[in-house]
């Protein structure tokens, strides 16, 4: 059984070695670079591919996978929208993901982001750096325990966030087209219209699908309370970024914490200090005084990295052994 790992990061390497030690019958080779048309020949001789792509792969890469008789592509992420399901299916290549590498990590990040927004952490830091230590109305805060928090998307991550928000005393409501009983321990289900119109903080936790694309847009923003705070630790494509910027400039949305952007692929995870951001919308989001932007790192904990490596390799080898795999995506 032979597997190859692409786009291996420094912090992932020890966990790959740890996994290999407990699976001596599996050959696992690694490359630090992402898989592209330029290095696709490196796939030859492998049955399983483990990747974490930030940019879509060229069609010829999928064709080469088929020519090499690759059996499975395992992504080390929960999201799989960057892979071409049509071409994978065409070449008989199965797809797996890591549906849950650390919901708690992302839930913690959502809570931390909401606290930074509602307690005006960025504004306070700006005043302090100017040695302005006055108590003043722009930094007067509302406690989360006196707020209603709306959770859009109540899967594993949404539930983790709801549990943490409830833990600080917030009234937590949620909406999901597929509600589940487990979530009711932490939140009360309401309609999407009610969630949008009554929440003081809205936290997004849905996957990127056709139905969720630009779910947050000019129309849905208009339904929200004036002065609402928005937290997105999900996928960038669930927000119409231009509509968000317009609403921030008009004061409809008081502040936003964004850990994802729809077209972030060319920029993360990279040092862009010497490279201009040519995407003007992205540049405005990053620089906006009422936006806390982070480069898709809500998940980024030691626990999550270990789970991403172990679970993706486990899924890959499970498929190669011909066994049922709970992490397989139906194509």
Curated annotation (Swiss-Prot):
Q: Which family does it belong to?
A: Belongs to the D-isomer specific 2-hydroxyacid dehydrogenase family.
Please name the Pfam families in this protein's record: 2-Hacid_dh, 2-Hacid_dh_C
Which keywords does the record carry?
NAD, Oxidoreductase
In its UniProt entry, the species of origin is given as Treponema pallidum (strain Nichols)
- Broadest EC class assigned to this enzyme: oxidoreductase
Q: What are the TM regions of this chain, as residue ranges?
A: none
What's a single GO MF annotation on this record?
A: D-lactate dehydrogenase activity
Organism domain of life: Bacteria
State the active site.
Answer: 235, 264, 296
EC annotation from Swiss-Prot or TrEMBL: 1.1.1.28
Q: Which of this chain's residues are annotated to bind NAD(+)?
A: 156-157, 176, 206-207, 233-235, 259
Keyword NAD assigned to the entry: answer is yes
Q: Which reaction does it catalyse?
A: (R)-lactate + NAD(+) = pyruvate + NADH + H(+)
Task: Give the protein's recorded name.
Answer: D-lactate dehydrogenase
